[in-house]
Amino acid sequence: MKLFHISHTDLDGYGCQLITKEYFKEGFFYNANYGLEVKLSIKKVLEQVLEYKEDEIIILISDLNLTFQEAKDLDNDVDKLLKNGYKIKLQLLDHHISGKKSAETFPWYYLDDKRCATKIVYDYMFEEYEGFDCNTSDWLKPLVDAINAVDIWLENEVKNFEFGKVLMSMIIKVREINNILFADLNRDFRCYLLKQAAKYLDEVDGHIKLDNDVHFMKKDFLKLSNKDDTLDNLSATYLVKTLVDVKDDLTVIYKGHKGLLTYCLGSISIPANAFLRANPEYD
């Protein structure tokens, strides 16, 4: 089965993808905010599925409410693929009430405003598939409950709500890996942090301990050796390594000079100089 999963760009959206990554292990993942990003992500998925006519395909959209026109267009596009012999299951799982009209019109559009999307996706894994074993559920279910508490604002669930607030802040502040140029790595980074954060759920004042340790969790992910360094330096070294991995795709030649064309990278001076030192063939 080939999974294509589009989700939102916040804690709830990445929580959904942590779940599908744990279950399916591999797939094609995209994150989008509303408007044009959603349209482009859907367009990309519909182009990619053309390569997998012999496979069973699931297109999952989570924590994103489509406009009625977007839902209608997607329904028509998938229907055409089905008539051409593709084996596609389309499913949208969301909790935003603004999608009510679409949910009442299209059977694949599931809406429940009493649960966040992460919790809906988690339950869906048990309803439609085999769910998770006890070892995974033991850490994943409490994490889902914390995300649910903060996303739909359940202040009465004090422990989950406070923990969820730290999770939300942690995910918002992931800036060490660019989410445009390195979307997959950025997503993996966020999912890593969420999975590590789950270890604090059973601790006394776990939300405070997690808040204190996020800095060190980031450093552990970014370290390419056992040598410790500042977070900025580790980020720069990691960025240089990722740029080297894709430098052939980003290289430009102009008037005999060799350069690297990057985009959407802020605070570039430190990693740029580190890249040039490590790759002297570039001007």
Residue spans for each PLM region:
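Hydrophobic, aromatic-enriched interface-forming segments
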Residues: V144-K247
